Amino acid sequence: MSYLVIAFLFILGTLLGSFLNVVILRYHTGMGLGGRSMCMSCGKKLHAHELIPLFSYLIQRGKCRSCKSSLSIQYPIIEALSGFVVLILALTLSPILGYSMAVFITLFVYALFAFSLLLVISVYDIRHKVIPNALSLAFALISFFSIFISISGPVVPSVLELFSGVFLALPFALLSLGSKERLMGFGDVKLIFGIGYLLGLSSGIMAVLLAFWIGTVVALVLLLFRKFGFNLKTEVPFAPFLSLGTFIVFVTNISVASYIALFV
């Protein structure tokens, strides 16, 4: 993959990230996704040169050109993160190019939809400590239809694949209901349900394990340094860790089965 293509994919990802920021900030606010972007502080309509992903934020030094209020650091972070996600997904799926360009584009767009949803869900969970049902349902539906797709074309899924989401989510559903959502929110359970279909049962288990491991390390670091007012009673959004675990498993193709095989 040439440097020009890599640059194009990253720029494409930052543009996607700019749109995802709009979705995150306007969701459940009564504002539609149409219409021009505006400063969330003074309401000033933004011009094209103020909407260039990453660069506009840097050039304006993180402030609105009109009212000088600080812009959320979320803007450049999500734009950059989306750029890397698009690039990494394309590189992960690039071997398929030797088989079929059409199949590559289909799977790439499919993966892009799925991980864009996960990114929106993750940031929304960080901001509001809740996962909207509509977003988790959309992710579950996209993930479910993935079991009917393969490199060679449409396939008939096995019984295990048909119920992989159910099998993966069931223990956590019992944990959530049994603890009255104190140990795990049911929104996380619905997200795990979709992950089971996107990755399959074995890889899905690995993604959830990674989420718990990464989440534990982050929580311990925050607790140790008392960052952001973090303490033992602080509610930790779990969707970002589930999304990160899912992304790592997707691009590395690791699973519980492959992990166990290393020691057998």
Give the ranges of each region predicted by the language model.
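Interhelical loop and helix-boundary elements at the membrane-water interface
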Residues: M31, G35, K63-Y75, V123-L137, ...
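Hydrophobic alpha-helical transmembrane segments
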Residues: N21-G32, E50-L58, T106-F115, S158-V159, ...
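Functional transmembrane core segments of multi-pass inner-membrane proteins
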Residues: G98-A102, F113-V217, S258-V264
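Residue-level signature of transmembrane alpha-helical entry/exit and packing/kink sites
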Residues: S2-F10, Y75, E79, V103, ...
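Membrane-proximal soluble regions of multi-pass membrane proteins
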Residues: L20-Q74, F238
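Structural signature of transmembrane alpha-helix termini at the membrane-water interface
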Residues: V23, Y27, F84-P95, I105, ...
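Short microdomains enriched in Cys/His and/or Lys/Arg
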Residues: L58-L97, V103
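Alpha-helical transmembrane segments
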Residues: L4-V22, L174-L183, V189, F193-V264
